[in-house]
């Protein structure tokens, strides 16, 4: 039997990237919206920033990379998850060859620069920014950290920790 490719049924791979340090609803919403960019039956692949990368660009991660990877793999929209490269963020793009790279609404990537660099490296994929963002009291890891720092815990509250 001869097989043919029908673009209407072709499964698209969407790649989403991030730190995913302290998981919160904003992460879940981003991943759901990222997967939708690929249409029906899309496959969502998530690439997590390595601890060394997070330290260099943001802060020391609260949760280590292996545990962050384990938690992200448990999230409903995620089909596969990987740790990124410590030296070349495009290495995993080259290896996985996604159809679409999803950029979060709060991620500081210049879409045009990213597209140009992908083309320069011979990588053919769309780059799309997730436009929606679900606001909530604790919709970022930094907000969670700041709230914890402000709280005063007495010994009774911590005795079972």
Curated annotation (Swiss-Prot):
Pfam families documented for this protein: CTP_transf_like
Ligand binding (ATP): 19-20, 24-27, 106, 133
EC id: 2.7.7.2
Reported cofactor(s): a divalent metal cation
Uppermost EC category: transferase
Gene: ribL
Domain of life, per lineage: Archaea
Species per Swiss-Prot/TrEMBL record: Methanothermobacter marburgensis (strain ATCC BAA-927 / DSM 2133 / JCM 14651 / NBRC 100331 / OCM 82 / Marburg) (Methanobacterium thermoautotrophicum)
Taxonomic path: Archaea, Methanobacteriati, Methanobacteriota, Methanomada group, Methanobacteria
Keywords for this protein: ATP-binding, FAD, Flavoprotein, FMN, Nucleotide-binding, Nucleotidyltransferase, Transferase
Similarity section: Belongs to the archaeal FAD synthase family.
Assembly: Homodimer.
Protein purpose: Catalyzes the transfer of the AMP portion of ATP to flavin mononucleotide (FMN) to produce flavin adenine dinucleotide (FAD) coenzyme.
Protein name per Swiss-Prot or TrEMBL: FAD synthase
GO terms of biological process kind: FAD biosynthetic process; FMN metabolic process
UniProt xrefs under CDD domains: cytidylyltransferase
Disulfide bridge positions per record: none
